[in-house]
From Swiss-Prot:
NCBIfam families: PRK00346.1-3, PRK00346.1-4, surE. It catalyses: a ribonucleoside 5'-phosphate + H2O = a ribonucleoside + phosphate. Pfam families: SurE (PF01975). Its EC number is 3.1.3.5. Belongs to the SurE nucleotidase family. The lineage of its organism: Bacteria, Pseudomonadati, Pseudomonadota, Gammaproteobacteria, Lysobacterales. Gene3D superfamilies: Survival protein SurE-like phosphatase/nucleotidase. Binds 1 divalent metal cation per subunit. Its cofactor is a divalent metal cation. InterPro entries: SurE (IPR030048), SurE-like_Pase/nucleotidase (IPR002828), SurE-like_sf (IPR036523). HAMAP family: SurE. Nucleotidase that shows phosphatase activity on nucleoside 5'-monophosphates. This is 5'-nucleotidase SurE.
C-alpha cells in the first residue's frame, strides 16, 4: 500500500521516523509529509491567510511550514505525484486519550485524511513526561493495524485512534477496542513575568482522568493494553435534540416581536 505518514511533533521527531521505517519494512511505499517544527495542539486548523512553504528533505520526505492538517490536505489535493491509499499519523510522544482528541494535531492529521476519502489511523505512545522508550512497540502496532484495515476495511467515516503503553512489545497484554474516556477541566493557566515586567501566560496542564473506567481508552492503557478507539466527526448531541426542539416555537415567535 501507499501510505502517507504525518504527525504534529515535526518531521524530525523520532516517532515519525521510526513509524515510517517500520511501514517500509512491512512492504509499504511510504511518503512523509509533516510540519517543519513541533505543532502539537494545532487541532484541525488550516492555514488560509498566507501561502504555505514546503521543503523536500529527500525523495520520500517533505517538511511543511504549516499545521498537521495543512500537511495532509496538501498531500492529498495535488502536492504528491501519486495518491496514497491510507493516512497514518504519529507516533505522537504522549497520549491522545479522551478529550485530548479535540486538541490533538496527531488525530487531526488522520481526520483530514478521512475527510478527503482515505482510511486513517492516529498512533500515540503514552509516555511519562514525554520520555519515550518504546516507539518500536507503537510502530509494530501500527503495522499490524494497517494490515487489518487492508484486509477488513472500516466504514468510510471512521478514524482509528490508537494509544500504546510505553512498554516492550513482549510486555503488552493485548489490544482492546475502547470508547473515549474524558478528563476533568484543565488545570489553571500559569502566569509569569517577561523580562520587561509584563504578564505572560502558559496554558495549564490537562485535567486529571474523570471517566476512566473499564471500557475506556484510559483504562486499557493503564492496564497494559493497546487501545483502539474508532471515532468519527459527527458532533451532534442527539440526546439534546428534543429539548432544543422545544425551544423552537418560542424562538420563532421572537422573530415577530420588536427589533
Amino acid at each position: 500500500m501507499r501510505v502517507l505518514v504525518s504527525n504534529d511533533d515535526g518531521v524530525d521527531a523520532p516517532g515519525i521516523q521510526i513509524l515510517a521505517e517500520a511501514l517500509r519494512h512491512g512492504g509499504h511505499e511510504v511518503m512523509v509529509v509533516a510540519p517543519d517544527r513541533d505543532r502539537s495542539g494545532a487541532s484541525n486548523s488550516l492555514t488560509l491567510d498566507v501561502p504555505i512553504r514546503t521543503r523536500r528533505i529527500d525523495a520520500q520526505t517533505c517538511a511543511v511550514a504549516g499545521t498537521p492538517t495543512d500537511c495532509v490536505h496538501l498531500a492529498l489535493t495535488g502536492m504528491l505525484d501519486c495518491d496514497p491509499d491510507i493516512v497514518v499519523s504519529g507516533i505522537n510522544n504522549s497520549a491522545n486519550l479522551g478529550d485530548d482528541v479535540i486538541y490533538s494535531g496527531t488525530v487531526s492529521a488522520a481526520m483530514e485524511g478521512r475527510f478527503l476519502g482515505l482510511p486513517a489511523v492516529a498512533v500515540s505512545l503514552v509516555t511519562h513526561n514525554h520520555q519515550a522508550h518504546h516507539y518500536d512497540t507503537a510502530a509494530r502496532a501500527a503495522v499490524e493495524i494497517v494490515a487489518r484495515l487492508k484486509a477488513d476495511p472500516l466504514p468510510a467515516d471512521t478514524i482509528l485512534n490508537v494509544n500504546v503503553p510505553d512498554l516492550a512489545w513482549s510486555d503488552v497484554l493485548g489490544f482492546e477496542v475502547t470508547r473515549l474516556g474524558n478528563r476533568h477541566r484543565s488545570e489553571p493557566c500559569v502566569p509569569q513575568r517577561d523580562p520587561r515586567g509584563r504578564t505572560v501566560y502558559w496554558i495549564g496542564p490537562a485535567g486529571p482522568e474523570q471517566d476512566a473506567g473499564a471500557g475506556t481508552d484510559f483504562h486499557a492503557v493503564r492496564t497494559g493494553h493497546i487501545s483502539i478507539t474508532p471515532i468519527h466527526v459527527d458532533l451532534t448531541r442527539y440526546q439534546a435534540l428534543e429539548t432544543v426542539a422545544g425551544w423552537v416555537g418560542g424562538l420563532t415567535a421572537a422573530l415577530d416581536g420588536p427589533a
